[in-house]
């Protein structure tokens, strides 16, 4: 059996004990009500967190989602000892429900009947992917400029560098990498590809060193870090997927269910913060002493702001230095936001669970999910209008 803290796979899960604490209340409640607890791990990776969830909570089941076929296969084999309590899914995490439509498995049956007890997301690129030079994620070793999390489909980083206009390159470097020298770098990339198409990472690193002034290279870590991050985010449409999945996974939570997000860069954390704020915002006009009917939010924040790793965790796991954790819990169903495409199936104390109507799972949940997404977007738009007036 793999050690739950390091694993035979060599991966050290970040803030493992705290993640177990955040998931525990909803899983324990489901267990006491004799209902299976289904956890969605939207970023399975090496499976360190999922392995611990399955070990700590005997009644828990996990749907493990990953875009990387090779890593998904390795992790599925390693977790085979959990048998029918684990179900692997090859998909981008914002498409997890569509990927389950034709699935026939006990975990999926439990998801259909009771929804999710928890959704868990450990965002960003995994350390195992960084260690594979042929994937192109690292700027420390020369390799092909690929950067796809799913190598079976989509454009590569080389495709981006060789086909995007100067303006498009400058935009992604500035927006996704917060690169001060986005314009000069974009011009240099376009100039160099006219001599020879981009294909390897070391050539790009050399160009970055040659373009960014020496005084700027002395601060802020490796000078190629921001460019490689921007390319990876663009290649994998990471931020678009994150915006989509937050309201979607929350729409599948049963009462008391929680969604937990671990972010490692400011762009991710800002999106998580914004989306969760929209979900937990009352629709009652400001100034009224109580919430109007059907205006109270269906979710509340579990974490105060974002949680960070403590000193002990940082010493044990260097990757934990930049992590930010946010979590939300479902506290109700407003009349305008009913259980997504479902009818009451079981009630016990304060917890009610739901089962999908007949027809495909995707169709059954579409109406409620679309309403939740729409409500979140309206809250974001309203907040932007208010901020713009101030």
Swiss-Prot record:
Keywords: Cytoplasm, Methyltransferase, rRNA processing, S-adenosyl-L-methionine, Transferase. GO terms for molecular function: rRNA (cytosine-N4-)-methyltransferase activity. Residues 282-390 are annotated as: Disordered. It is found in: Cytoplasm. Residues 348-358 have a biased composition (Polar residues). It comes from the Bacteria. It catalyses: cytidine(1402) in 16S rRNA + S-adenosyl-L-methionine = N(4)-methylcytidine(1402) in 16S rRNA + S-adenosyl-L-homocysteine + H(+). GO terms for biological process: rRNA base methylation. Disulfide bonds: none annotated. S-adenosyl-L-methionine binds at residues 47-49, 66, 93, 122, 129. Transmembrane segments: none annotated. Its main location: cytoplasm. Its EC number is 2.1.1.199. It holds the Pfam family Methyltransf_5. Residues 305-316, 360-372, 381-390 have a biased composition (Basic and acidic residues). GO terms for cellular component: cytoplasm. The keyword Disulfide bond does not apply. Specifically methylates the N4 position of cytidine in position 1402 (C1402) of 16S rRNA. Belongs to the methyltransferase superfamily. RsmH family. PANTHER family: 12S RRNA N4-METHYLCYTIDINE METHYLTRANSFERASE (PTHR11265:SF0), S-ADENOSYL-METHYLTRANSFERASE MRAW (PTHR11265). This is Ribosomal RNA small subunit methyltransferase H. The lineage of its organism: Bacteria, Bacillati, Actinomycetota, Actinomycetes, Mycobacteriales. The gene is rsmH.
